[in-house]
Amino acid sequence: VSSDTYCTKEHDSLKISNGKWHWFSRQTGGKTALDYLVKVKGCSFMEAMEIIHGAPLPRTIPAPVSRAESKRLLLPERNGNADTVIRYLKGRGIHDVIIRYCLENNLLFESRKYHSAVFLGYDKDGVPRYGNVRGTVGDYKGELSGSDKHYSFSIPGSSQTVHVFESAIDALSYATLELFEGKNWHEDHLLSLAGVFVTKREDVVPVALSRYLADHPEIQTLRLHLDNDAVGRGAVSGIVGGLRDRYEIWDEPPKCGKDVNDQLKIRVGLKKKEEYSR
């Protein structure tokens, strides 16, 4: 076009001058050969680099994406003793034998700062992965930071039966009732679901139960002791719908009161019997 301006045969509106180029019909331009090859020739970045380099570039294999690391459970500092927690649980009707068992097997401890009851859940390798916190004053309920609900509080047994509860306190309440009956309260597995939720589906199995069954393939029978309310009844329907083809399932809600702890407190005289007893 002139002594310092050039154009190409393919694109007469593309002008090149002093190391820069501009494609007027496309309203685009650039300063480098890489820009030109990508924007004008339609090369990929790697193709353009190979042309500039004059030889194929070595191909690299992307490093495999690792699975997200397991959540790290943040445990609070333990108190020097568990006197407050013991007193609180006894006030809920739970027998001292059951409380001591949990303390001695690191299933339960008292936090130093708030003197709360901390119920721990472990994975199959014995690593704590879940922590349920219950305030000993007031109605506080919560979970430790980093808790994984797949590994909620449980007391493993030696039989082929697991008893399922909504909370750790319900599980300990059931163990106490079994103790009162003179039974071996830790022969069967006891599992807390760490709460349940409302769902419209009829085959939803809580993750804590799914994980526990996967880790304990010997289990053949489920006995459900969920609450006497709409949420508890709905959770039972979900479990039955999702597992009835693989397990023998018994629905055994509390005989009186809203939950198993209510049933225990009524049994030991800490609470009056509710009108909706069943």
Q: Where is each model-derived feature located?
A:
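Conserved mixed alpha/beta catalytic, RNA-binding, or beta-rich assembly cores of soluble enzyme
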Residues: 164-169, 195-198
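Short active-site oxyanion
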Residues: 158-162, 221-222
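Short active-site loop/helix that positions an aromatic residue
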Residues: 39, 171, 175-180
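Non-catalytic accessory segments of DNA primases and related replication-initiation nucleases
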Residues: 1-90
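Basic, glycine-enriched DNA-binding surface that flanks or lies within the catalytic cores of DNA
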Residues: 9, 65-156
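Short secondary-structure junctions
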Residues: 1-5, 97, 249-251
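TOPRIM fold recognition
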Residues: 178-278
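Terminal peptide-recognition signature
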Residues: 23, 37, 89, 119, ...
